[in-house]
Amino acid sequence: CLATGVNYLDTANYEPLDTAKFEYSWQWAYQERFQQAGLMALLGSGFDPGATNVFTAYLAKHYFDEIHELDIIDVNGGDHGYPFATNFNPEINIREVTAECRHFENGEFVTTPAMSTKASFTCPEEVGTYSIYRMYHEELESLVVNFPTLKRAQFWMSFGESYLKHLEVLGNVGMTRIDEVEFQGQ
């Protein structure tokens, strides 16, 4: 975008092809160059990240003097009528679900194994109760920078049992890996 002089907009952050990791620092490094070029770069303009950041800003502006704890809970245990269905790009979804969890606690990011923290969450208005798993999601990085009173920030997501079983099978046969696999010596 810088080379062609056009504005930049994304719904999720950059993920390298060969590394199962994502973070905003790679994109934030371009901020000064975009400003000097008079160009806009809007990162994370989807739902999470995106709407979750807007909701947090709205609450901070209109309802709270300070926010100390923030839990973002993405409840969608649907199956779309298929045995295995993701609600986002399947490759990216599998990467983020199988990656180490990072959450913000007492001024720093803490790392725990993927899917190691499970809780139960009851949605309002008879939607139901869901098992949710703490996982890393990129908006945590921008939220703790822009809301410095946060002492804890966590992201949680629900998954249907069929999804979890299929993910386990894919992992067991090596299909959640991103490294190259040789077949017949190639």
Q: What does each model-found stretch correspond to?
A:
Residues 2-6, 11-39:
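Rossmann-fold NAD(P)-binding glycine/threonine-rich loop
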Residues 7, 40-41, 151-154:
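Conserved beta-strand segments of alpha/beta enzyme cores
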Residues 21-29, 54-56, 166-168:
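Short secondary-structure transition/capping segments
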Residues 30-77:
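Adenosine-phosphate binding glycine-rich loop
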Residues 24, 49, 53, 133-137:
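Short-chain dehydrogenase/reductase
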Residues 62-186:
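C-terminal catalytic/substrate-binding lobe primarily of soluble NAD(P)-dependent oxidoreductases
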